A protein has these predicted regions:
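Terminal, non-globular segments
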Residues: 173-180
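Conserved short beta-strand edge segments in small beta-sheet-based binding/regulatory domains
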Residues: 160-165, 191-207
Length: 210
């Protein structure tokens, strides 16, 4: 699979600009049907709102992009929202910004800043993760070797998983695919060649983007 970025979790972030309420709803989605279902659900829930503008991006290559101004002046809502998602390189995500008009007009520039700002604030508060594939490495150690294993892991910043204690110690680590070779080399050198290891099935992980 190709690595991609998306939001850490679904979320809602609200702010007030010149007495208008802007509520940004964000959701992780994987299909256009799911995205539109989410958007329509917000519209139904907030049917009394002045506008429910939306944008979403789908696909590992960000190949599907859609946006809607939902009655706001053309180009002042959906596209600015979409641009924020693009600038953060996010995909498999949908955003709806619900506006409750407060009586003060913002003008085209003000609307663009408000809708883009609502999504930017939501992305910042919700957080971003990189979704990627990591390779598994199964390691078999003697009990004496396992006593030193934590020191080796700490040097490389690795965690152990599914550790089993039988006549020997069987444990797992996961690393980015480009780090498999150097990790195996490091492991072999640490134990002076007296260690058994093999690559196993990969897993999908979500790494926070700081």
């Amino acid at each position: 699979m190709k690595e991609f970025k998306t939001i850490k979790e679904d979320g809602i972030v609200e702010e007030e600009i010149k007495k208008s309420r802007f509520i940004c709803f964000m959701k992780r989605v994987t299909t256009e049907e799911e995205a539109r279902e989410f958007i329509n659900g917000i519209k139904k829930e907030h049917y009394k709102a002045s506008h429910n503008c939306s944008a979403f991006i789908l696909g590992e290559n960000m190949e599907i992009k859609r946006s809607s101004d939902d009655g706001e002046p053309s180009g002042t809502a959906g596209v600015p929202m979409l641009t924020v998602l693009e600038n953060h390189e996010l995909t498999n995500v949908a955003a709806v910004v619900t506006r409750y008009f407060g009586g003060i007009k913002l003008g085209a520039g003000g609307l663009i800043r408000a809708y883009a700002g609502a999504v930017s604030k939501a992305v910042k508060e919700i957080g971003v993760v990189e979704v990627k594939e990591q390779k598994g490495i199964s390691i078999t150690l003697s009990y004496a070797q396992y006593q030193e294993f934590a020191n080796w892991r700490a040097e490389l910043g690795l965690e152990e998983y599914d550790t089993q204690f039988t006549t020997e110690v069987q444990t797992m680590i996961y690393v980015d695919k480009e780090l498999v070779a150097p990790t195996l080399t490091s492991l072999t050198e640490f134990y002076h060649g007296k260690v058994t290891s093999q690559e196993t099935e990969p897993r999908i992980v979500e790494v926070p983007v700081h």
